A protein has these predicted regions:
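Short, Lys/Arg-enriched N-terminal segment that forms or immediately precedes the first helix
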Residues: 1-9
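Short, contiguous hydrophobic alpha-helices characteristic of membrane insertion segments
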Residues: 9-10, 58, 66, 116-117
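N-terminal helix-turn-helix DNA-binding core of bacterial DNA-binding proteins
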Residues: 10-53
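Basic amphipathic alpha-helical segments that dock to polyanions
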Residues: 54-61
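Beta-hairpin "wing" of winged helix-turn-helix
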Residues: 62-78, 83
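Basic, amphipathic "hinge/linker" alpha-helix immediately C-terminal to the N-terminal HTH DNA-binding motif
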Residues: 77-96
Length: 117
């Protein structure tokens, strides 16, 4: 049986925006490092998002009007929180549905049996 300790960056890159949108739809607002740690925790370390991958995606989602930002001073640090806009909430659902359908198609294509969870 194949065991992958961490998924390839190519696989993650294609789903990163959807991952971010999904997390923000469940958590209202999050800051960048919090997003990376949440993904790492939820996937038992199989998906580790680097800052170099995350922040360009966050900025792209913000430029697309899907995210809004708010900065807060935490001690001597400035922390930037991201949250979904109304449009972002709608697009999040579309992206999640699209990815779910894609995974089901890949499962069929590769003749895989659904995993028991």
């Amino acid at each position: 049986m194949y065991h992958c300790p961490m998924y390839s960056s190519e696989l993650i890159k294609g789903t990163l925006k959807t991952i971010v949108l999904k997390l923000l739809s469940e958590n209202q607002e999050m800051y960048g490092y919090e997003i990376t740690q949440k993904v790492k925790d939820l996937t038992a370390g199989k998906i580790q998002i680097t800052e170099g991958a995350l922040y360009p995606s966050l900025h792209a989602l913000e430029n697309e009007g899907l995210l809004s930002t708010q900065t807060m001073n935490i001690g001597k640090r400035v922390r930037k929180y991201y949250s979904l806009t109304k449009k972002g909430k709608s697009v999040a659902q579309e992206k999640i549905s699209e990815l779910t359908d894609f995974m089901n198609t890949m499962r069929f294509l590769l003749d895989l049996k659904p995993s028991a969870q």
